[in-house]
A protein has these predicted regions:
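RecA-like P-loop NTPase motor core
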Residues: 190, 194-198
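P-loop NTPase nucleotide-binding/switch module
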Residues: 78
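P-loop NTPase catalytic phosphate-binding loop
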Residues: 1-75, 83-87, 94-152, 158, ...
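Tight coil/turn sites that cap or link beta-strands
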Residues: 169-170
Length: 198
């Protein structure tokens, strides 16, 4: 997911988290280099953990370990359906994936984690072509672009231009794994998000 300042990216992430929390067994870890201010409304939720970048490498490594543990459990007869969903949200992922160890682990998760009910949401204001080349880019099946400054930024996320023409405030283009067709949608802003939290 990408979107410049004023695009509505943070609000859209808040909406996604609110929807995910409707499933009471879902556990969410948020890595936010800005200190979690955009996600403060979730800080007291039992199933939400908000971390800063100093804790990122260890947290991502723990997700890889959990993924491998789930594969081993499944090989011993435990069904994936009995496992809780674990969601890792990384805001401003550009800076983190310059770290080779972090980049390698994100690539492992993006390649293998879905079957074990572990999912990634990667967000950035300005995607970097070098940072997003290779395995991470090819194994992230669904893409969302809110408004960006340049057509080249749109192409990094969507493989085509168009996001540079969006108007901001939740205006977005989305490509889902279930469809090759790009959709133009408008996100919403919930006035009192607390009212929708379980």
């Amino acid at each position: 997911m990408e979107g410049q300042t004023g695009s509505g990216k943070s609000i859209f992430l808040q909406n996604i988290i609110t929807c995910l929390l409707q499933n009471k067994s879902t556990e969410i870890t948020i890595i936010d280099p800005k200190g979690g201010g955009d996600f403060a409304v979730f800080r007291e939720r039992e199933k939400v953990e908000i971390l800063d970048t100093s804790e990122a490498e260890a947290a991502i490594e723990s997700f890889v370990e959990e993924m491998e543990s789930r594969y081993q459990s499944n090989a011993q007869g435990v069904s994936y359906e009995s496992m809780s969903y674990k969601i890792l949200i990384i805001d401003e992922v550009n800076d983190l994936i310059k770290n080779k160890a972090i980049s390698a682990n994100i690539a492992r998760l993006s390649r293998k984690a879905r079957q074990s009910r572990i999912h990634l949401i990667l967000a950035t204001q300005r995607p970097d072509a070098k940072a997003f080349e290779g395995e991470i880019r090819s194994t992230i099946p669904s893409r969302i672009a809110l408004s960006v400054q340049k057509s080249t930024e749109s192409k990094i996320i969507l493989d085509e231009t168009g996001a540079e023409k969006l108007t901001g405030r939740g205006d977005m283009l989305i490509k889902l794994v279930s469809s090759s067709e790009m959709k133009h949608i408008l996100g919403v802003k919930v006035g009192n998000i607390q009212a929708f939290l379980p």
